[in-house]
Design a protein with these regions (language model features):
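Recognition helix of helix-turn-helix/homeodomain-like DNA-binding domains
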Residues: 32-47
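Residue-level marker of alpha-helix boundaries and capping positions
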Residues: 4, 15, 43-44
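A detector for short, charged/polar N-terminal pre-domain segments
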Residues: 1-8
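Short basic helix-loop element that most often maps to the first helix and adjoining turn
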Residues: 11-30, 55
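Short amphipathic helical patch at the helix-1/turn junction of helix-turn-helix
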Residues: 7, 18-19, 47
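Conserved short acidic donor-positioning loop in nucleotide-sugar-dependent glycosyltransferases
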Residues: 70
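Conserved hydrophobic/aromatic packing and binding residues within compact polymer-binding modules
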Residues: 13, 27-28, 38-41, 67
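DNA major-groove recognition helix of helix-turn-helix/homeodomain DNA-binding modules
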Residues: 32, 51-66
Length: 72
């Protein structure tokens, strides 16, 4: 279950990033991470912590529900 959620979050993160015209490298720098680390967020390998979820939702103009694939 945890792995499935990480994959959903990663896919939605990638879609939102691309919709904003941003690169993995750009967002990685904003998070003080390497691009390879950021790539693992989008691949669902590394889970995001609370602060990164909040930052990325605000930065990408999405809600946590959007990120987690939850329909209202």
């Amino acid at each position: 279950m945890k792995k499935e959620i990480s994959k959903i979050v990663g896919e939605n993160l990638k879609l939102a990033r691309k919709a904003k015209g941003l690169t993995q490298t750009q967002l990685a720098k904003e998070l003080n991470k390497y691009q390879s680390d950021y790539s693992e967020y989008e691949s669902g390998i590394i889970q995001l912590d609370y602060e990164k979820i909040v930052y990325l939702c605000e930065r990408l103009d999405i809600t946590p529900n959007d990120l987690f694939g939850i329909d209202n």
